[in-house]
A protein has these predicted regions:
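Membrane-embedded alpha-helical core segments of multi-pass
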Residues: 128, 143-144
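N-terminal Rossmann-like FAD-binding beta1-loop-alpha1 element of flavoenzymes
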Residues: 3-30
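Dinucleotide-binding Rossmann-like beta1-alpha1 core, especially the glycine-rich loop
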Residues: 47-134, 138
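FAD-binding beta-loop-beta segment adjacent to the flavin cofactor pocket
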Residues: 37, 137-143
Length: 153
């Protein structure tokens, strides 16, 4: 069997990639050891949002953080593609993006999140630091130990 592109993994990323490649005329084959979209993509916790993972920088691994930061425009493009896919297909693909929080329990962590947000915004991500009543209103389930958060809708 011949194919232009073989995609290993039939989850949300593999199937999406196959769709967009096939739409452009590429002969694509998707293989997976399970039925498509039945593992993590079909039964995940539902946290789908774009946000920089900062714990690498908090641990001093700035090189790894820089590599992730360089990929942020791709993550943003991926989010736009989900909406494009729904319009093309004419039905909801059941992908919800309700935003995400990265929390701080100390003043040092909060200052770090403020720097992180500045970098995210510079790269085109809509995010912001929330504290106090605004944070409690947004996420009343958080512990009182949380003094602030980076919220990315």
């Amino acid at each position: 069997m011949d194919t232009d592109v073989l995609i290993v993994g039939g989850g949300i990323v593999g199937c999406s990639l196959a769709y967009f490649l096939a739409r452009e005329g590429t002969d694509v084959l998707v293989i997976d050891r399970f039925d498509l979209n039945t593992q993590a993509s079909g039964t995940n916790a539902g946290s789908l949002h774009v946000q920089m993972m900062s714990f690498f920088a908090m641990e001093g691994d700035w090189e790894r953080y820089a590599r992730l930061e360089a990929k942020l425009p791709l993550y943003l493009a991926g989010g736009r593609m989900w909406r494009e896919l729904e319009r093309e297909l004419g039905f909801e693909v059941e992908v919800k993006s309700g935003g995400g929080l990265m929390v701080a329990e100390t003043d040092d962590q909060l200052r770090f999140l403020e720097k992180k947000v500045a970098g995210e915004r510079r790269l085109g991500l809509t995010s912001g630091v929330v504290t106090g009543a605004e944070l409690k209103n947004l996420a009343p389930y958080l512990s009182d130990a949380v003094i602030g958060a980076d919220f990315c809708p």
